[in-house]
């Protein structure tokens, strides 16, 4: 893996291929390896960069997180993630780059576009679970609070079951999300990663400060992506709302919420039709 030294962290990332830079931002998984099957499909057309977000995978903190980062209203980590992606983009290319964020990674991508539009050539938001600008934002914020409380009081299994039901996660995705790692070490790491996401992301990222105006001023750069196998899920409803209010196009893409690993060939074909 490649390394970029930043304030407070060593950011590590996979890089394959040739051509214009395309950065993938992972969601709750946090690590770029989940995009490697997709990168193989695109490496003849793009320099594909799949990043381990700060404090996930091989990336490491060189300074501790501030105590305030676990506050449900803190925007520290999502803003820091966005700054990391912008600094990575500038280190890799003198030109604006392509960016795709998936799930909470798409929320990071929104903040990249909002705060660092100069690094963005084109950007895609794949099934973003953000609620800030929705008419029923308070309802969804309370639901995330309830999920966190249930996990902390009744255990991870029950809480994640509620999470899947609340967001209407498709069966193809629920099966993958609940699949345990192959080794005991892997299962421990999986648990730690999930609990980190619970403490620092599920509430903070989904209710971070993004408005519809943040999209409209850059609408020519944005594509919304919804999976063909995850219809009816909450993240798709978010994209439908953005589309209704702004006119930014939605493109159907193969697979579900994890379509890039479920159907990488078809996922790549859509990206090449968009940007190739």
From Swiss-Prot:
Task: Tell me the leader sequence span.
Answer: none
Question: Which residue ranges does the record assign to the AB hydrolase-1 domain?
Answer: 20-137
Name the GO cellular-component terms: membrane
Give the enzyme's EC designation.
3.-.-.-
Q: What class of enzyme is it?
A: hydrolase
Please give the residue ranges the record annotates as the region Disordered. Answer: 57-76
SUPFAM superfamilies membership: alpha/beta-Hydrolases
Alphabetically ordered keywords of this record: Hydrolase
Supply the Pfam families for this chain.
Abhydrolase_1
GO terms of molecular function: hydrolase activity
**InterPro entries this protein is in?**
AB_hydrolase_1 (IPR000073), AB_hydrolase_fold (IPR029058), AB_hydrolase_sf (IPR050266)
Q: Which family does it belong to?
A: Belongs to the AB hydrolase superfamily.
The protein's name in its UniProt record: Uncharacterized hydrolase SAUSA300_2518
Q: Report the source organism.
A: Staphylococcus aureus (strain USA300)
Q: Specify the taxonomic lineage.
A: Bacteria, Bacillati, Bacillota, Bacilli, Bacillales
């Amino acid at each position: 893996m490649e390394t970029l030294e930043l304030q407070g962290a060593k950011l590590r990332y996979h890089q394959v291929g040739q051509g214009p830079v395309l950065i993938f931002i992972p969601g709750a998984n946090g690590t770029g390896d989940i995009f490697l099957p997709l990168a193989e499909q695109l490496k003849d057309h793009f320099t594909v960069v799949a990043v381990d977000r700060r404090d996930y995978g091989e990336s490491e903190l060189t300074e501790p997180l501030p105590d305030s980062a676990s506050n449900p209203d803190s925007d520290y980590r999502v803003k820091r993630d966005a700054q990391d992606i912008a600094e990575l983009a500038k280190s890799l290319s003198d030109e604006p780059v392509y960016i795709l964020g998936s799930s909470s990674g798409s929320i990071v991508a929104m903040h990249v576009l909002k705060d660092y539009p100069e690094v963005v050539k084109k950007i895609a938001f794949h099934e973003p679970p953000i609620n800030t600008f929705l008419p029923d934002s308070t309802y969804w914020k309370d639901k995330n609070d309830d999920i966190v409380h249930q996990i902390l009081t009744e255990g991870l299994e029950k809480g994640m079951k509620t999470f899947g039901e609340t967001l209407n996660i498709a069966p193809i995705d629920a099966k993958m999300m609940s699949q345990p790692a192959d080794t005991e070490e892997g299962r421990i790491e999986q648990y730690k990663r999930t609990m980190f996401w619970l403490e620092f992301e599920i509430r903070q990222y989904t209710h971070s400060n993004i408005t519809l105006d943040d999209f409209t001023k850059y609408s020519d750069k944005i594509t919304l992506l919804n999976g063909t196998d995850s219809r009816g899920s909450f993240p798709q409803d978010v994209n439908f709302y953005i589309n209704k209010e702004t006119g930014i196009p939605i493109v159907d893409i193969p697979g579900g919420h994890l379509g890039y690993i479920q159907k990488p060939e078809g996922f790549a074909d859509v990206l090449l039709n968009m940007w190739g």
